[in-house]
Amino acid sequence: MLSSIAKLSSMESFELYIFSFGFATFDICSLVARAVVIMEFLLGSFLVFNLLHRFTKWITAAFLAIFSIFLLWRLIKGDTESCHCMGDVVDMNPTQSLIKNAVLAIMLAVSWKTDRCVFLRQNLIAFHIAAVTMVTVFLICPPDFYYRNTSESNDLSQEAFRPVADSLDLSEGRRIICFYSATCEHCRHCASKMAGIIRRHDIPLDSVSVLFMQTHVAQDSVVTAFYTEHGDGLVLPYHDLHPFDFIPLTNGSMPLVTLFKDGTFVKEYDYLSLDEKELASFFND
């Protein structure tokens, strides 16, 4: 239960971690992340109240085995970074998470034959707990595609940006132009999300540019750290703009991801409305 709550409190990081493996679209990874949180909370709740004890313990054992195999695979790959088993609340690497799983497995084995339940109508109680858990998770943390379907970003000042694009040679061909600040938390998440999309769909790096609002005198070192820590090491071409030049372009909103074709504005996204399918098809049409 604690693990699920920790993941829910840092859902953005958890879904980006799943997306980083590139096995599915970000939307699917968002659903997988929430499914994991829901399952962990339900299994924890059922174990605490000893509901559906036989089924719950077998499923819990299967989950521990699957996650442990995954952690062993990450260790073999040389991964020493956080596996997000406890979200961002407790930073645990694969080795530490394996130890945690071993302790949980021992606790599960000790309690295996405990089958006494003080509740009648276990199935009904379990159903209500499951329903409330699912609704709560999606209410507290809706997937990004919910916002994509309910809002549209229109923050870029195209008139103000046109001379900037011309001066930076960004007015030819099909281009993705991102507007970030290296100190903005949502920009960091957006950079990780964009890195996953670019790699998954082989989007040409020379067709993607980033405009950073300058926040430091030594901006180059700040941007390098930004790409290393939050862009999965994917270094994109970038330019720095003084805040007095940057803010009028986006009306102070960031991050923004925009599409241009030969200098003509096509589409704009904020972090939540970012559409992986549209970004990929933009270069394939």
Can you say where each PLM-predicted feature lies in the sequence?
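Functionalized membrane-embedded alpha-helices
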Residues: 1-9, 30-70
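Cytosolic-side transmembrane helix boundary signature
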Residues: 102-129
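Internal/C-terminal transmembrane anchor helices
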Residues: 119-146
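Short active-site neighborhood of thiol/selenol oxidoreductases, capturing the structured segment around
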Residues: 168-188, 194-196
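Conserved helix-turn-beta segment immediately C-terminal to the redox Cys motif
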Residues: 191-213
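Thiol-based oxidoreductase modules, predominantly thioredoxin-like and allied folds used
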Residues: 205-223, 232-243
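Short, internal strand/loop/helix patches
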Residues: 228-256
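Non-catalytic, surface beta->alpha helical segment in thiol-disulfide oxidoreductase systems
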Residues: 248-285
